[in-house]
Amino acid sequence: MHNDKQRKYLENIVQGNVIEGRKDIAKTIRNYLCKSYSASKVAERKFEYFQGIKKEQENIIAELSYSNFWWVNDFASNYQYLAEGGEAKVYLSNCGTKVLKINDAVYYNTWLDFLNSIILHNIYFINTNYDLIGFYNIDKTLYAVVEQPYVVANKITELDAIKIHLSNNDFQHKKRFDFCNEKLGIYLEDIHDENVLTFNDTLFFIDTFFSL
């Protein structure tokens, strides 16, 4: 459940309004893009249709990264390659407490959608906060560089536990591993035991996909 201030904050994200408060890279770029673009809707998962818009946003992010020194040029000395999924390469920090995810937002229609997803994740799942530290460009492909606490599970995650946890934030189970907060119009997809880990009966949502 959310208090009035939190609810208004979430409504501003959904409605495409500028969000106030402490600014980080994700919020700064998201607010900038919202001046010219709207988030795509969950029913509009049409990558080819949004390809031009996504490229425009990529160019804007590149310009902002140059002017604000957001390019990440070297991380190899502090991280070791760990794994690779559909959209991200994952590296483990040398100290073993954090992971670095290099994400090209391939599953999102636009970069604005990707940034909204990061911001929503950080509201709902504080213990696995995404810290967007900058961007990385290789072979003409833009990647977001995101740091997150490293979590090791000691128990299998049960879907019923996920349902209970999410229902406390007004997310209702819709089908398979998808949930929806109908009051706010926020969708949360692909929530299963590989993306949600359990340690000492605490759930850690390590990989989420929010959409509006």
Language-model region placement:
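ATP-binding glycine-rich loop module of kinase domains
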Residues: 41-54, 61, 75-127, 141-143
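Short Pro/Gly-enriched beta-strand edge/turn motifs at strand-loop
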Residues: 69-76, 171-179
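Conserved structural core of kinase catalytic domains
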Residues: 104, 122-177
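Active-site ExK catalytic segment of metal-dependent nucleases
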Residues: 99-105, 149-151, 207-209
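Juxta-kinase regulatory segment immediately upstream of eukaryotic protein kinase catalytic domains
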Residues: 1-77
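Protein kinase-like catalytic core scaffold
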Residues: 98, 144-146, 187, 204
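Conserved hydrophobic "DFG−1" position in protein kinase catalytic cores
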Residues: 92-93, 150, 198
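Catalytic activation segment of kinase domains across protein kinase-like and atypical kinase folds
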Residues: 180-212
